[in-house]
Amino acid sequence: MKVLMINGSPHLNGCTARALKEVADALAAQDIESQIINVGNKDIRGCIGCNYCCEHGKCVFNDLVNETAPLFEKAQGLIVGTPVYYAHANGGVLSFLDRLFYSTSFSKVMKVGATVVSSRRAGSTSAFDDINKYFTICGMPIASSTYWNEVHGFTAEDVEKDLEGLQTMRHLGLSVAYLIKSIALGRERFGDLQLPVEARTHFIR
């Protein structure tokens, strides 16, 4: 069992990375493997709406998005970490997720999703909501914790002082692991959840 983790911060060893490490350690203690993909330090362009992916099964821009797609398909969970910029998620990680989710046709139903946000002070809950939208449109259950999944600080050293934030990350790791294992057991007994999309309208037509 494996979880793919996205670090949306340009700082590879910053606050977001520190939070994700705490989650990864909790997952490892539950025998769940994790792999981190660093996105925030990459030049990721946004979707241009060309629909190349609809015909070819991959994004027209052959970059980290296409490299990540098969890893996402094989993973049982996806955890996205982002710093908070002006009360929203990092623009680069949003561009990455737009293209990753839109260009991949494989089912994401029952893959566990979770968001981790890092802020110096405020704006974290709206950034948290930004990322969760990707999960809820795809039938992905969202793992929660004992507080909103956030840490506070300006440096990774600051995050070490956020004892409740780190506790929240550990609890999130346990929650993700529990959901993944429970869904696996459910599949053994009940099979895959089928959600056929038979209607697709533009509001009314």
Predicted feature locations:
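A short beta-strand-loop structural module common to alpha/beta enzyme folds
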Residues: I32-K42
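Cofactor-binding loop segments of dinucleotide-utilizing enzymes, especially the Rossmann-like FAD-
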Residues: I6-G8, V39, V117-R120
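Generic secondary-structure signature for well-ordered alpha-helical cores
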Residues: D25-I32, G77, F101-S105, T136-M140, ...
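Cysteine-cluster motifs in flexible loop/terminal segments that predominantly coordinate metals
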Residues: K42-F72, A199-R205
